[in-house]
Design a protein with these regions (language model features):
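The canonical Cys-X-X-Cys-His
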Residues: 221-231, 273, 287, 291, ...
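Beta-strand-rich N-terminal accessory domains
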Residues: 19-144, 158
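Axial heme c-ligation environment in periplasmic c-type cytochrome domains
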Residues: 226, 232-246, 259-288
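Beta-propeller domains with acidic blade repeats across secreted/periplasmic ectodomains
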Residues: 299-662, 679
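Surface beta-strand/loop "capping" patches
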Residues: 124-128, 132-160, 652-679
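Short, surface-exposed alpha-helix to beta-strand junction/turn motifs within ectodomains of secreted
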Residues: 676-715, 740-748, 756-759
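C-terminal capping alpha-helices of c-type cytochrome domains
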Residues: 275-303, 731
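Sequence/structural segment immediately N-terminal to covalent heme-attachment motifs in c-type
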Residues: 210-230, 244
Length: 769
């Protein structure tokens, strides 16, 4: 971004007192205080004081960064479905000589110090930023700063800055400087000054498209860079691979246009390309014209890729049998608990002690909402109130002792309602020191509270330059204390969009397939473990450490695609098992886990589809219902092309015939059914498909199944109640995935088998070390 600097003759007016009197203002935006990346700098706070004045603070260093006339463009994945972009400012600077550097003096000498962001608070329509300066002697000086737009007697625009200091030790002076001028704050008191600027009559307009090819502009404004990169395969092929494989003739271009608009699979492996019906044919042709300019002299096979050779057969499949489910699980009733005009992209979901639901939203509002009467399921009785706004991509939420904590992209924040009006007055920073850059993919997911600590997951950056490195905190689970201190528990993760409590008060996460992750995972968090993503390995190691095995491998597009938050089932027929959602494939999967040789392992079952959008967050309410928060990104991370959803599933008592559990045994496996298998059915071992393989992590997106083989069942024993099957299988290998596919059996009550497949991760075989 380029801002025009205005040469000024500033008038600085000093005063030594300040007030908190009401100061009604006509703010230019409904949400006028906004956390985000800004102009490629993380941890920024933009304040829209007036149409004539925006200010931005670097909250990482607690300093005023810029004052300008213009505005802010909220662009990017959460705002405009453009993953490769981030918010930028536009307009013209009032000054480039701001007093924006802190100084500490002790007995006339400069003192070492560091500054800590403590958040901000709204009082009487003014914003008060809170900082703490820790001196070399560990004194903690508290500072409040309140900026406001004013005009001088001559009509010139100005910025008023009010300060309040406390806990300043004797002999210590706190001041602001720009290298030439200083302003000393009154110790343990109030201070203020106003800077007047020359008016800006014609601020620089919003930035125009910067790319030199219209096709690239269209791609940046769409979601193309979510799944594709220029020279390396990601979810889909690289643009260079496309340019090398296809000729730029009318027949081929017509087919590619159709593929982009309608979606499909099979050309580049198992990954499904989502359709883009919103794109016009002319726009797609312009994009393709740009892609063909990327053609190289390399052969297609020399471009980094990971095309799968084990495509699933399309024949002899039906919903739940070799293919995804289509409808709602028969044992549950589904209710949509939002009105049509409320469209939340749910980033976090929890409940208050009084039963009200709390959600955070991954959108341009960055909101937190209190939703009442959700247990009724009646949208005429359900009420929604915005509790907070302006948060930066809040993808985690937790309620602790009735207090709301939210995990933003760059900060763990406590939201405080001081006056009881159900609107947050204070956004208190608990932790904002973990590593972060401006990369769009550095998501922070969460949030779980356990025994005095919060647990959150950090996503890897995906658009670093060749001379840049991943920050040490990325691709990790962090344990964060109430005092803001944190430690890294496990590392080597990629995009761990899900964390929650599991059996025995343990913590489980999900991670998404990609580079060095041949399939998605359900992982039991054990301190110190490395989980395979080599971008996050310790630089001092010449070789990566051994990769810890997940509790469950989740085969891409067979079982899941973009797994999200897991949740432990508290009651009912699936008590003690876990469920997890899927943002891209949609629906919910069920996870049965058991402990073998002291470690968790288990299997995945398809559970339900029939929901309004991809599933991002899950939480059980006091009424026993499963509450479902949906989220989608146009084109890339979405199910059915929809971006929002809020529903609940309530158990209705209707039995469903399905596999309840698969347990590893010394002889093979035990399969437990929810109902008796019909006595009219002959259990034929040759009709049950058993396969095994292991996954090879590679630098490419995903990874191949290695040593894929079909296994034979030597013998089947069935219990007298026809609910338990004991499968005696030779040739099983540890650290392999075992695939099961049953025939389309029916139960003794003539119910059809809901789903025939399961995938078991056999890390250990009982009875073997």
């Amino acid at each position: 971004m380029i801002l025009r600097c205005i040469a000024i003759s500033s008038l600085i007016l000093f005063a030594t007192c300040g007030t908190d009197q009401p100061s009604p203002k006509n703010r230019p935006k409904d949400v006028w205080v906004i956390r985000s990346v800004l102009d490629r700098q993380p941890r920024m706070l933009t304040i829209a004081l007036d149409t004539n004045c925006y200010v931005a603070y670097d909250v990482a260093h607690c300093t005023l960064q810029k004052v300008w006339k213009g505005g802010i463009i909220l662009q990017g994945a959460a705002y405009t479905n453009q993953p490769n972009l981030q918010p930028v400012s536009w307009g013209s600077l009032y000054s480039d000589t701001l007093l924006n550097k802190w100084k500490i003096g002790r007995e006339g000498e400069a003192d070492d110090f560091h500054v800590i962001n403590k958040g901000y608070q709204f009082r009487n329509d003014r914003l008060y930023l809170k900082f703490a300066i820790v001196t070399s002697l560990n004194d903690t000086v508290k500072i409040e700063e309140s900026p406001e737009y004013v005009t001088g007697d001559d009509g010139r625009p100005g910025l008023e800055r009010k300060f309040k200091t406390s806990n300043v030790p004797p002999g210590v002076k706190v001041s602001l400087t720009n290298g030439k001028s200083n302003f000393v704050l009154n110790s343990n008191g109030t201070s203020e000054f106003t800077t007047l600027f020359n008016p800006i009559t014609h601020p620089r307009e919003s930035p125009k498209e910067s790319s030199d090819h219209t096709g690239r502009n269209y791609m940046e404004k769409s979601d193309c860079y979510t799944c594709h990169e220029v020279d390396r395969q990601n979810v889909g092929p690289s643009f260079q691979q496309i340019a090398v494989r296809y000729k730029s003739d009318e027949t081929i271009i017509g087919k590619l246009v159709s593929k982009v608009q309608n979606g499909g699979t099979g050309e580049w492996g198992t990954s499904v390309m989502t359709g883009h019906p919103q794109l016009a044919e002319g726009e797609i042709r312009t994009m393709l014209d740009y892609i063909f300019t990327l053609k190289t002299d390399k052969k297609e096979e020399d471009i980094e890729n990971n095309q799968s050779e084990d495509l699933p057969p399309a024949a002899n499949t039906s919903p739940g049998d070799g293919a995804p489910l289509k409808g709602l699980h028969p044992s549950f009733d589904l209710t949509t608990i939002r009105k049509d005009n409320f469209r939340p992209r749910v980033g976090g979901l929890a409940f208050m002690p009084d039963g009200r639901m709390v959600i955070s939203t991954w959108d341009s509002t960055g909101g937190v909402y209190l939703i009442d009467n959700v247990e009724t399921g009646d949208t005429n009785k359900i009420t929604v109130k915005r509790f907070a706004a302006g948060l930066a991509e809040p993808l985690g939420l937790e309620v602790v002792n009735g207090e709301i904590y939210v995990l933003q992209k760059h900060e763990l924040t406590k939201l405080i309602d001081h006056n009881g009006d159900d609107v947050a007055d204070e956004y208190a920073s608990i932790c904002s020191s973990y590593g972060a850059t401006a990369d769009f993919h550095e998501f922070a997911f969460g949030l779980v509270y356990k025994e005095g600590y919060f647990y959150a997951t950090m996503s890897m950056a995906m658009r670093l330059m060749s001379n840049e490195k991943q920050l040490p905190d990325r691709g990790a689970v962090l344990k964060i204390g109430m005092d803001g201190r944190y430690e890294k528990l496990i590392y080597g993760l990629r995009q761990p969009n899900g964390i929650n409590h599991g059996p025995d008060n343990s913590i489980f996460i999900t991670d998404n397939q990609g580079q060095w992750l041949p399939a998605s995972k359900l992982i039991h968090v054990k301190q110190g473990e490395y989980h395979g993503m080599q971008w996050g390995r310790i630089d001092t190691l010449s070789e990566p450490p051994p990769m810890a095995m997940p509790a469950i491998w989740m085969p891409e597009n067979e079982a899941t695609n973009s797994p999200s938050q897991p949740v432990l089932v508290p009651d009912g027929p699936y008590k003690g098992q876990m469920l997890h959602g899927d943002v891209t494939a949609g629906g919910i999967q069920r996870d049965f886990i058991e402990k073998i040789n002291g470690e968790y392992q288990g299997c995945l079952f398809r559970f339900t589809q029939g929901l309004e959008t991809g599933v991002n967050r899950l939480c059980f309410g006091k009424d026993g219902a499963l509450y479902i928060g949906g989220l989608g990104l146009v084109g890339g991370w979405s199910y059915n092309g929809k971006q929002w959803g809020l529903q609940k599933m309530k158990y209705n008592g209707t039995p469903t015939f399905e596999m309840l559990a698969i347990r590893a045994k010394s002889y093979g496996f035990e399969i437990e059914m929810t109902e008796a298998i019909s006595r009219n059915i002959k259990i034929d071992p040759d009709k049950i498909t058993i396969q095994q393989w292991w996954y090879l992590p590679t630098a490419s997106y995903g990874g191949p199944k290695m040593n894929l083989e079909k296994l034979s069942i030597k013998k089947i024993d069935i219990s007298t109640d026809r609910k338990l099957l004991q499968l005696h299988i030779d040739g099983l290998r540890k650290e392999h995935v075992i695939y099961f596919r049953l025939p389309k059996w029916s139960s003794e009550t003539n119910r059809p088998l809901w789903t025939t497949e399961s995938w078991y991760t056999l890390n250990h075989i009982p009875g073997r070390n």
